[in-house]
Amino acid sequence: MIAPLSWLREYVDIDCTPQELEEKLFSCGFEVETLEEVGAHISRVVVGLVTSCEPIEGTHLHLCEVDCGSEGKFQICCGADNVEAGRKFPTALIGATVCETNKERSEIVGTVTIQAGRLRGYDSFGMLCSGMELGLNEDLYPGAGYNGLLVLPDDAVPGADVKPLLGLDDWLFDIAITANRPDCQGIYGISREVAAVLGKELKPLLVSYREEKVAPHTLKVDVEAPQYCPRYEAHAVKDVKIQPSPAWMRRRLSLVGVSAISNMVDITNYVMLELGQPMHAFDRRDLIGDHIVVRTAAEGEKLVTLDEQTLTLNPSNLLICDGEKPVGLAGIMGGLNSEIKETTTAVVFEAAKFARDNIRRSARALGKRTDASAHFEKGTDEYTVELAMQRALHLTEELGAGTVTDESAGQNTGNSIEKRPLTVSLARVNGVLGIEVPGEAVCRILANLAMEPELEGDALRLKIPAYREDMESYQDVAEEVIRFYGYEHLVPSFLKSAEVTSGGLSERQRRELKLKETLAGGGMYEAIHYSFFSPADLKLFRYPEGSEALRAIRILNPISEELSLMRTVLSPSMANAVMRNQKAGNLSGRLFELAKVFIPKALPLTDYPDERAHLAFAFFGKEENFFTLKGALDLAARSLHVKFRYEASIEPFTHPYQTAAVYVGNVKIGYLGKLAYDIAGELNLRTDAYLAELDLETIESLPHEQVYFTPLPKFPEVQRDLALVMAKSISCDQVVNLIRSCSPLIREVKLFDIYEGAPIPPDRKSLAFTVTFRPEEKALAPEDTDALVQQILERLRTSCDIVLRV
């Protein structure tokens, strides 16, 4: 937000330089992104009194003698139509820097340095300036909008710098407001912090006004959607006179980039900038029935907004309506049918608190992000709603814009506007900080923040202002204390609540790091995602009713709907990663992610969820297939010191004939498979994608196989290829296990061919294996190998009617 120094000084006596104030703000947690002097582009421009002004014959020019006080007297040629003797104008001396305009003098195009010149045979030693040449407009300084010279007041002292006179010595602080401090979205909120950090008194906001009694009171407010609008206030003003705002208000609005419109509209904008609370003003004549209704929109309902755009709404959008029709999109923009006009004579001011998540979703969905919606998205509070209304009514009276009546209406189903008690332990506050901050210093700091501290022994009793919704615990109090006590007082210390160790990685961290290094060494890239995903992801992956994957925890204040659920599985995120890669032109790749999923013990939450480590893979591209992904899983298995077993399986989101369940022993720990064609189509994938996901937590809980040293073989291995014919219902895994069970000399059984078709009967298939024998005591003679093969064939025939293909 932009905060002019002159505006801050209205509420705090600031006696330090702008640069020192910037450092002070940074020290208490507010980063000043830019600090800029309003007239930084202007230099060596002083007040000049024209003592003589003679026309140059045959031209539009005048030859002027200009008295610039201590700077001297100068001859200057000027072509402005309003130059005359006895008047004072901004005078740019030789070497001065001013704004350069285009030929039409309609906009500033840069800066220019003034040099001595010669016009029509006359020397000119400077330039008399217009408002635009000083970077001013009519709102920043009255008269600056005139195309001729800027006329200065009669009491301006010749030779004096014009910057203080024209407000060009003001400074603009562009302050980054963190998400937890919505109370600092306005000038007054920042002034509270400035007063606290400087140890100065905060001047009160002027909010008094006189009400004129009127009868009868017909204004009504009904909030039909209190979950989206916990507080709504409306107040009537009569005898309204629509006219331009005074110069001081127009200047402040202009300094922060807001255009002045008319007094009543400017008041609402001014209050938003000052307090961070958006407001709106309705033409009361357009409120049918003198009735304001806050409700959700009907499906397909229409509203024409102030920018003359027609919006088509749905029940997720919140509306402000009169007795018959919508008159505004709540928290975002008013309706064209109730705008303030030159003929407006009665106004209803609106101040409200709207649910930030609802405003954010509506603004994004409708493409209508405004200053008001930006403020509501960050958050407002019930206390500031009332304060803003009082301030707007005070300004109405101060500007003579209308008569404040005693007619108001509203509804508050939200938080109290009174201070709320909070008691914390001073020892715990200091425990968080790791230092001992004296109780007197703690109380002084918190008193400067209007928290009315009382310290009795270790008990620190506070009264938290309603606008500080972020203050909930002793950790929050500790943050406030150290912000103003000074981070430079912090010293390294051990956590008192934790066991002191020598540091380093835990055993689990070492295993996970080794696993990541192994996978990266295998040509895979690590993917890192948010811990959230979208409800649409779960729907796309067709998880069955009752599935653990569907028991996702909804985030109360999500970044967006696409990131509104805590992840219960990683596979949807990996599929989306493939989609993003292919959209960016990367059509092949091997990705893995090691991250936690969050499984609630019960919904709604009654306890912390189980956090389980999962490992997921996504292979995509023309060179990838089921077996390249299986190889990656085998690589992971070796790193984890386990053996994976694979069985044909079905997942709701994979190809029915290219999916396997992954087991360790008899415990299923995951799956691998080819992403189903229809899901790949929904994601607009241009190649096949293969996914896998393993539950590392379950693997960790299983007994790991012991690793023994095996000496190098003394005798050569022997291999035999067997092409076997069997029923189609028999799985490869069954055959491998049968073969392995025939002899301890069998080291490996590897499938290398699958065949179906003539001359194999239609109900049978052929699987070809390479069987590797490793003798331990003596070399295998051919007849020994033949005997082992016959033993295998006999076991296969008797067990599963599997025969050798001939």
Stretches with model-predicted labels:
Residues M1-S208, V348, D371, H375, ...:
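Phosphate-backbone binding interfaces of nucleic-acid-interacting proteins
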